[in-house]
Amino acid sequence: MVGASGGAAVQRGDVYLVTLHPARGREIRKTRPCVVVSPDELNAALGTYIVAPLTTGSHPYAFRVACRFQGQDGHVVLDQLRTVDRARLAKRLGALSDVTQRKVLTVLQAMFAP
């Protein structure tokens, strides 16, 4: 699938290296892997994406999903969701496993539609 900009379409579950700075206060900062959590229909239409950072230095909290990506254990930090422009997506790194993607969607549903 090809996106509007001519590159590969950004899809839910894809992991990109994303530039998150500037950040304020306790927001996760710097350039780090993030998983796209917005639906494909939104991704194709808007050119902005809802992402959740991945981190290896996290504690297990209710809104963080344990994951393994590129050989490293970590967490999807769903309490730090951000909407970012395509320009912040530096490089596609891969995608989360289907099992982890389902867990992410389950936690998001619990967060927003309890």
Please name every model-derived segment.
Residues M1-P114:
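Conserved functional hotspots at enzyme active or ligand-binding sites that engage polyanionic ligands
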